[in-house]
Every structure is written in structure tokens, then in C-alpha cells.
A protein has these predicted regions:
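Catalytic cores and adjacent binding grooves of peptidoglycan-active enzymes
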Residues: 50-115
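Soluble non-cytosolic domains of exported or imported proteins
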Residues: 4-12, 75-82
């Protein structure tokens, strides 16, 4: 599958995640999305705080801020994160949730072995 095809599927799945969160009356706001390689380095290059192999650099990851009943949820162990993460993982075989590696607000697709 070409990268652009995978990016399109990823974007559609992000839409489904947002709708699922809304159906649970969870609020989401944008966090990190695309990390421009001119700033953060190409894949395999570490130029800032980001991982050298971050799939944010190839438009296959997005971070969100979560609100439950208007309260910002910073605790990655909150049950709402788990509910969103498990739903995300069911949307596609490449869907990876950052809660499995201590980054609960991170939703991505694995690509080239990176997540």
C-alpha cells in the first residue's frame, strides 16, 4: 500500500475516533498532528524533542487533549483514555494507541515498524 493511501485511511479513522468520543460526550481538542521534517528532521533524524522515527513526520499520528464533563484529563490511566484507545485499535490492523507505551493521547498507524 502506498503511503498516501495509508494516510487517507488514517484520516478517515481519526474522523471515526472523533465521532466515537463525541458519542460518549468526551471532548477532544487538537494536540500534535503533522511534524514538519524541516523543523523536526526527516524520518530517522532527530532534530528536536520528537522521536527520530515519529510517524507524526509522515502524517500517520495525531495527539489529542481529552475533556470529560468539561475537565481536562491529563492522567493517561483515566478510563476514558482506555475506552478511546481500545476503540481506536479496533478500527484498523495498523492502528496503535499510545496508552500501550505511556503516551495515552497518541493515536497512530504503524508504518515501517514505527508507531
Amino acid at each position: 500500500m502506498r503511503l498516501s493511501e495509508k494516510q487517507q485511511i488514517f484520516t478517515a479513522c481519526i474522523g471515526k475516533l472523533i465521532l466515537f468520543a463525541s458519542s460518549k460526550e468526551y471532548g477532544l481538542t487538537q494536540g500534535d498532528g503533522y511534524r514538519d521534517p524541516r523543523v523536526f528532521g526527516e524520518m530517522g533524524e532527530k532534530r528536536s524533542y520528537t522521536s527520530k522515527n515519529s510517524v507524526h513526520k509522515i502524517r500517520l499520528a495525531h495527539d489529542f487533549n481529552l475533556f470529560v464533563k468539561g475537565e481536562f484529563i491529563s492522567d493517561g490511566g483515566h478510563p476514558a483514555w482506555l475506552e478511546l484507545g481500545e476503540h481506536w485499535e479496533c478500527l484498523h490492523k495498523d492502528a496503535r494507541w499510545g496508552g500501550r507505551f505511556d503516551d495515552a493521547n497518541h493515536f497512530s498507524f504503524e508504518h515501517w515498524g514505527c508507531k
